[in-house]
Amino acid sequence: MSGSRLFFGVSTIVSIIFAILLPMAHAQSAAPAPAPTSDGTTIDQGIAYVLMLVALVLTYLIH
């Protein structure tokens, strides 16, 4: 009886240790977020340049 009790105690302790350590061994660090390729100010500036060019062409054609 003592041998099976000892085996049960050792196997319980080993299984608890594995249950704690194995998930930590497989964990991966989070990858950093990629840098934004374009933000809103770049798009707004592009639209502003196009509108200024249209206004310049219209002013040239009207006069």
From Swiss-Prot:
Pfam families: AGP. One of its GO terms (cellular component) is plasma membrane. A lipid is attached at S38 (GPI-anchor amidated serine). Contains 4-hydroxyproline; hydroxylated on Pro-32, Pro-34 and Pro-36. Residues 39-63 form a propeptide. Glycans are attached at P32, P34, P36. It is found in: Cell membrane. Its main location: membrane. The modification 4-hydroxyproline is found at P32, P34, P36. Proteoglycan that seems to be implicated in diverse developmental roles such as differentiation, cell-cell recognition, embryogenesis and programmed cell death. This is Arabinogalactan protein 41. The lineage of its organism: Eukaryota, Viridiplantae, Streptophyta, Embryophyta, Tracheophyta.
